[in-house]
Amino acid sequence: MKLPKHLKFAAGAGGAFLFGILFGWVMFPAILKGQLKKEMALSKKTDVRKMWETIPFALNFKVYLYNYTNPEEVQKGGVPIIKEVGPYHFDEWKEKVEIEDHEEDDTITYKKRDTFYFNQEKSGPGLTGEEVITMPHVFMLAMATVVSREKPAMMNMIGKAINGIFDNPADVFIRVKALDIMFRGTMINCARTEFAPKAVCTALKKEAVNGLVMEPNNQFRFSLFGSRNGTIDPHVVTVKRGIKNVMDVGQVVAIDGKPQQDVWRDHCNEYQGTDGTVFPPFLTEHDRLQSFSGDLCRSFKPWYQKKSFYRGITTHRYIANIGDFANDPELNCFCDGPCPPKGLMDLMKCMKAPMYASMPHFLDSDPELLKNVKGLNPDVNEHGIEIDFEPISGTPMVANQRVQFNMQLLKHDKVELLNNLPDTIVPLFWIDEGLALNKTFVNMLKFQLFYPKKAVGVIKWLLVTFGGFGLIGCTIYHYKDRIMSFASSPGSAAVTKVKPEEVEQKDVSVIGQPQEPAKINM
């Protein structure tokens, strides 16, 4: 039996409709998800693995130093007045070395190496790195603070050691060129024969002090970042590859072979989250991301803020802060004794240095911190931590991880140089480590993910629309044709015109004479 043309068309339209639904809403998402699971894992064949090993572009590493304009007043107990100088822009190249895969537990181990190059063109107007900055002497104050906390009976000796090592300084401030304090280093003279400075310098040689590099002739070179520039970090990091489960990709499971830290208390020692260079795909607005920072010995848990856009791609913006350790039960285990004010994190146990981490300009911190220093202006847009993720692939498109480092001006009666200082926490510098994917990598993401996704989106709606309207049209045509056929078939109850029949006229004969009607007399 030969089908009518409209039924053939209806079959085609129905097929297009069903294929549009099945392919567009069922098959393609499953194919895309399966492909992403393969591509986002840290297997040796993927592009993600290559970028994870060596980021093919430089990150933006910006340093803002605080210049103290009234050191003489501060030395006498006055309120510090500071002026921000920066940014000093450095191109930061990140790579992972000594990489080993472990098939049995789907992990990979590595060490990291960061290299910095000063970029004067991208630095603040007129900044060359040769500007002289006046700031609290980090090394001097750190030495005094550590002894006051751990061996207070030795504070008399520390006063003599300071005078010997730093040549009888007039105050606790250092006047130093910006690039020297950041990377090149400033000299610490340990070629002393007096007992106090010699004892301190001997202790320095035995311990690995952050920022301190040994030089010939009993000299040390101290800088904020120089010791990590171009050197391999000694710590061995173990993370999940995500081949067996892509949602585990990049998760830190051990450092130096230890499944957790021994720095803090309770769950604060756990490694929670990724290593910060790769994140799982398929993010939703309800997901809480986590990443572990080795520099601060803790995990951060950014939360979703809003939708945003970057170079035509819809992203999810996540934000974070340092936290309130005293009032947040999850963070209380970071406190060794009384918790610091809101927005401050004591790094003594992590860095072995009496430093405090905070948001730049004390953003989201205890208001009292701002009252103790003049010259700070916190701004959430300039000083907040924010990361824009492409949610399907979990790719960070734009990121600004900002943190400020602070130190307490130690007031101590047993050291003449310290006995008049204001007992307050003051800022030293803050950094902004960020990235913004350039056009090349954004286009790569568009061609590999978004253009196929958009094409399928257009095709599926065309198929569904064509199929839907085709089915409706064929249905209407089919039933209209049936009605007309039924109306014209024999034996139907249809009403037809009947032509009246002509009647033949016939002669009628009358028998007898016609009579008139009888008259009635009234």
Curated annotation (Swiss-Prot):
Protein's name according to its UniProt entry: Sensory neuron membrane protein 1
Cytoplasmic side: 1-11, 477-522
Residue ranges annotated as Extracellular topological domain: 33-455
Keywords on record: Cell membrane, Disulfide bond, Glycoprotein, Membrane, Olfaction, Receptor, Sensory transduction, Transmembrane, Transmembrane helix
Compartments (UniProt record): Cell membrane
GO BP annotations, alphabetical order: sensory perception of smell
Membrane topology: Multi-pass membrane protein
Any one GO molecular function term: scavenger receptor activity
One GO CC annotation: plasma membrane
Carbohydrate attachment residues: 67, 229, 438
Disulfide-bonded cysteines: 268-333, 297-350, 335-339
InterPro entries in the record: CD36_fam
Family in the record: Belongs to the CD36 family.
Chain ranges passing through the membrane: 12-32, 456-476
